[in-house]
Amino acid sequence: TRKLELLPAMISPANRADALEQTGAAVYNRIREAQLEGGSRVRYSDDLIEYQKGLAELSGAGLYQISVEGETGCAAVEYVDRDSVLCKELLISPAHMERAVALIAVRHPARRYHVRTPACWEGLPGGYLQPFGMVKWYNRDKEALWAACTHSYMGLGFD
């Protein structure tokens, strides 16, 4: 996972042409899969995304569909506390991430923003890689396949 911590002064103003809308689990999951298509990743059922939606809403945030310059992305956002927002996953092309974060900041004012994106995406300047999750194989054939591609995206942590 690539992580980034931002203060409000580091976030550009939102573009009025862009949009952030709260969305349901099935729509979120469809956008998520489209954004991650072709890459190695953990796939979640709509039920697990619904669980994440509940966690996000309990904190005062939610699951969002993001539109920037004709591209549709998504973000799972939670308040960690009243001053900190965690974007558990931001899935939109790196070229549009800055504008997506600006939309999140307008919707969820905070003193600090933590943003997670897939490790293989360049993302925003200042991001760093942090291993997230662990895989233990009990099937040697599948373990051999994994060795060919060790960079995979787990995404949501149900914490």
Regions found by a protein language model. Give the residues of each.
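Amide-forming acyltransferase catalytic core, primarily the GNAT-like/NAT-type
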Residues: 1-89, 94-95
